[in-house]
Amino acid sequence: MSVPTHARDRWEELVAQINEARSRYYERDRPTLSDEEYDALYRELVELENSHPELASGESPTQTVGGERSEMFDPVEHLERMYSLDNVFDDGELEAWFERVVKGIGSLPPMLCELKIDGLAVDAVYTKGILTSLATRGDGRVGEDVTANAAHIPAIPQKLSGGTVPDLIEVRGEIFFTLADFTTINAEQLEAGLPSFANPRNAAAGTLRQRVDKKLIELRESERSGARRAETLRGEVDRALRRLSLLRLTVHGIGATRGLSITQQSDGYTELASLGLPVSDRMDVRD
């Protein structure tokens, strides 16, 4: 059955709007839509594709995760794909999800419930206990290499400790600012005549997705040559390093592993905590 012209036209409008919103949110860290506005567009797109499955092509935002990788950073292919979370918007949708679970496995299993941190999703790889890679989620398969910045973020362990350290473990988590630090950062932005961040998530993304390593090299060269720009650069570098030091990390997932076997999410959290990785204390297992 062919798709009506009005449906295809609306699909194209929604795809364009959502892709632009994603670009501003994930790549430029300057969102123009509220979460509610974005969710409404996305829900309309899902409903349209459910009515006309022919529209659900690979170019649809419903078939992809996150945003494109910035050319500022080298690409990093995740060892295992990173997925995003699905949303429900009312009790009815949650009940429908429960019903699908029961239908799929025969009963409702114990569930781990956890508050979601709205931060920047990252993927960290530890090889023989040493942090060897830190990357953004990107499109779920390939992210941005921000490993150089990890050395300036005390919340990210550079080395695993305690427990039995696996040969390799890929962990996923959220980088974020506390509300208090976000308020301070926005006040600094305004005082410096810079635009404020729309929300803590975008402040965290803007802070992590900087080439501080290049700025440090440029600063050293400017100081050696006595360039006037050295003072300005020193202020930029100091601000970037200070903000990196304020970033927090909560680890909530495990990707590829070698020398580690986990069968339950709660056991995974226990293992991650034993290795010195920060996990949420806002969680509970419910039967």
What are these model-derived regions, one by one?
Residues 1-287:
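RNA/tRNA-interacting regions in translation and RNA-turnover enzymes
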